[in-house]
Regions:
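Inhibitory N-terminal propeptides of secreted protease zymogens
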Residues: 1-89
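Subtilisin-like serine protease catalytic core
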Residues: 109-214, 228-231, 244, 271, ...
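Short, aromatic- and glycine-rich surface loops/edge beta-strands on solvent-exposed regions
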Residues: 428-438, 453-482
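Structural recognition of the beta-strand scaffold that forms the well-ordered cores
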Residues: 59, 80, 121-126, 178, ...
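C-terminal subdomain of the subtilisin-like protease fold in secreted/lumenal serine endopeptidases
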Residues: 99, 232-234, 356-452
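Hydrolase catalytic cores
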Residues: 177-180, 202-206, 291, 329-391
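Substrate-binding/access-modulating region of protease and related hydrolase catalytic domains
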Residues: 186, 201-294, 337-344
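Protease zymogen maturation seam
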Residues: 69-121, 131-140, 245-247, 259
Length: 483
């Protein structure tokens, strides 16, 4: 695992603070960025390199972990990537704030309906949970005794699970837990969906070294969770390359569900009735390895990739499903600016809420409901799976699995050209953009293309080897089959 610094735009100084200076609205853009905001950024560990009064923003150098923590601060409204940078707009004091990804999956009403994952046991297998009880968004979770168990499989004799730190990534599990269960009552900020589930935490990975022994820790953690009756497990861990000993590295063709850890994950699902939600991994932009990592390749586990926020296109880093798998991987995807580690817990939190509604759902039923709620379903691909899940659709299916939603339109294209006029009621702004997934089979993507949201007439010329094209107009989908 690596965590390198990157230039980051943090849009700042709340407009409310500027208005308190008595400035007319037209002069707000000329007001200086509020000093208290800049001081807050510095205290959070960000190194400010530039300040823009027009953008009401500061440019900083921050690691991905620091940027993720900044995103969760009360003064940050949202975080979105902009040409390789991050942008975090200031957070105004609105009622019941949620993070952008929760807005993307349409989960705003879950809190209104009292869906918090209450009574559901959730296991989290990760690197470490350093200082988790001290995080503002997790204090209530610990104070109300929702963290029911902890076990360190890396260093069992360490003791003091939340104050002992062995590596620079020992707070990774803490951040994942925040994405699962975080809620800051002071700012009415909901970070995760399953704020009242019961959690069992397992540390199986050492952040400063990588070896196959960690896969054994993972399997032992699964067995421990199974013995406690845990039926929903989240893990943002994955293994492919980067082992300390090069001979331990996997080869791409081994991402076929045959690894030790993948076989255990598949057994957990098929024989033990556990629903495993696993991040796809962040190797999608690597030259020699673009695939998801094991155990995300296991049949039956719910693998989650990453999209951007505005168009729902695959993030460059998000791991791709190998073409030789007989099933679609990843299964779903949603927004994260900093890695698939923070998409899996979003879907796990959604799953916990569905189990609260219907505790009798099997692992297979729960997984299928989540996939059916994806905006591309049933036309999944190896970039973003069945797409971005829709929480309200999933809720309806959890209550009545016989519901049938309108299927995407399938059209046949003769020759090498295809044209289509977008219906006026197919909205795209705020609901995903216009995206083409150009494929060499029903599921395997050749390339993805993002078009202007103003596009009304689409003219396609068939690519070499292209057999299918998925056209996404927001949440409306058209599947083109080339003849």
């Amino acid at each position: 695992m690596t965590d390198q610094s990157a230039a980051t735009w943090i849009s700042a100084a709340a407009q409310q603070q500027r208005q308190q200076q008595g400035l007319p609205a037209r002069q707000l853009s000329d007001a200086p960025v509020h000093q208290a905001y800049l001081d807050s950024l510095r205290r959070s560990g960000a190194q400010i390199t530039a300040v823009s009064k027009w953008l009401n923003a500061a440019a900083v150098e921050a690691t991905s972990c620091q940027a993720e923590l900044l995103r969760q601060k009360c003064f940050v409204q949202q975080v979105t990537p902009i040409t390789g940078y991050f942008q975090a707009a200031s957070r105004s004091k609105k009622k019941d704030e949620v993070l952008p990804v929760l807005d993307q999956i349409n989960a705003q009403k879950f809190r209104e309906k009292g869906l918090t994952g209450k009574g559901v046991k959730v296991g989290v297998i990760d690197v470490g949970f350093y200082e988790a009880p001290q995080q503002a968004s997790l204090k209530r979770l610990f104070n109300q005794d929702h963290v029911r168990g902890y076990r360190d499989f890396v260093n069992p004799a360490a003791g003091k699970p939340y104050t002992y730190k062995e590596s620079f990534l020992d707070n990774h599990g803490t951040q994942v837990l925040e994405c699962l269960a975080g809620y800051n009552p002071k700012h009415n900020l909901q970070v995760g969906l399953a704020t009242e589930a019961d959690y069992y935490l397992a540390r199986t990975d050492h952040g400063s070294r990588e070896n196959r022994m960690e896969e054994e820790h993972f399997v032992r953690a699964l067995e421990w969770l199974d013995s406690l009756g845990v039926r929903l497990v989240n893990s943002s861990l994955g293994y492919g390359t980067g082992f300390d000993k090069a001979e331990e590295n996997y080869k791409p063709e081994q991402m076929d569900g045959s690894s030790f850890i993948a076989r255990a994950a598949q057994m957990a699902v098929q024989e033990k009735g556990m629903c495993l939600v696993i991040s796809a991994g962040n190797d999608g932009s690597k030259k020699n390895w673009q695939f998801l990592n094991t155990p995300a390749d296991a049949a039956g586990v719910l693998t989650v990739g990453a999209t951007d926020y505005s168009s729902w296109i695959k993030q460059g880093y998000s791991g791709i499903g190998p073409g030789f798998l007989p099933f679609v991987k990843p299964d779903l995807a949603c927004f994260s600016a900093f890695g698939t580690s923070f998409t899996a817990p979003v879907v796990t939190g959604l799953a916990a809420c569905l189990l609260q509604v219907n505790p009798h759902l099997s692992a297979q039923q729960l997984t299928q409901i989540l996939k059916r709620s994806g905006h591309l379903y049933p036309h999944g691909n190896n970039y973003i799976g069945y797409g971005v899940p829709n929480a309200e659709k999933a809720l309806q299916l959890a209550r009545d699995s016989t519901i049938v939603f309108p299927a995407p339109t399938i059209m046949k294209a003769s020759g090498n050209q295809f044209s289509f006029k977008r219906p006026k009621d197919w909205k795209v702004v705020g609901q995903g953009g216009i995206v083409l997934f150009r494929k060499k089979s029903a599921t395997q993507v050749i390339t993805q293309q993002r078009l202007s949201v103003r596009t009304t007439i689409l003219l396609l010329k068939r690519m070499t080897g292209e057999t299918h094209t998925t056209i996404q107009f927001g949440e409306n989908v058209l599947e083109v089959v080339w003849e």
